[in-house]
Amino acid sequence: MSRRRRVIHKEEKQDSRYGSALVARLIGTIMHSGKRSIAERVTYAAIEESRQSSDAVDPLETLNKAIDNIRPRLETKSRRVGGATYQVPMEVAPERGTALAVRWIVNFAKARKGSFRKALANELKDAAMGQGNAVKKRDDTHKMAQANRAFAHFRF
């Protein structure tokens, strides 16, 4: 991790159906052992299913709303100061917040029973309404940061 200069980020790839970088990131997170076509099929079906159950016209509207509801604003990072380790609250960069939100959605969808497609659709639906396990995880992350704000002066 170089401290010399800012990293120049590559342009994000977009998915073939919606032309969205967020959907491409979701597909990449779901993909296992390089099987992109299976991940795409599951993701597109889940997005369509979550859109049909809500009153949204645009299929990406539900996904974007779900990601915005899950994206954390604060998190805690461990910082060692003189033999003691403190959980120091830090602001989350937008890119990291999106990555965490996508990861949480996929992990909590995997934890649900039934087919992954239905579980992902239900998790997206719940997240768009401000409910579900991923939203609870975001709230827990914020509570942890709030509880440890006394250590905010250790921020680096």
Regions flagged by a language model, labelled:
Residues M1-S33, S37, Y44-F156:
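Strongly charged
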